[in-house]
Amino acid sequence: MKASMYLALAGLVLLFVVGYASESEEKEFPRELLSKIFAVDDFKGEERGCKGFGDSCTPGKNECCPNYACSCKHKWCKVYLGK
């Protein structure tokens, strides 16, 4: 009984120490996250010359990116697995 109480107490102390140590790193996390989100947003404005997975397409026009093919049945780009 005493051993399990000491083990639980040691676990709580370890959890507190790890949480306190990572707290300083977490203060910078929101700024880094926002900068990454806005950096990704800049790339959304650029259009590709081809259509990716799930984009609508017209069969026979070769609009899909490499390794994708336009499905005649569903009319969207899907992964081309060969014949």
UniProtKB/Swiss-Prot annotation:
UniProt xrefs under InterPro entries: Huwentoxin-1, Huwentoxin_CS1
GO CC annotation: extracellular region; host cell presynaptic membrane
Tagged with keyword Transcription: no
Tissues expressed in: Expressed by the venom gland.
Modification Leucine amide, positions: 81
Entry's transmembrane regions: none
One MF annotation (Gene Ontology) recorded for this entry: ion channel inhibitor activity
Record remark: domains: The presence of a 'disulfide through disulfide knot' structurally defines this protein as a knottin.
Function description: Lethal neurotoxin. Selectively blocks tetrodotoxin-sensitive voltage-gated sodium channels (Nav). Does not affect tetrodotoxin-resistant voltage-gated sodium channels or calcium channels.
Name by which UniProt lists this protein: Mu-theraphotoxin-Hhn2p
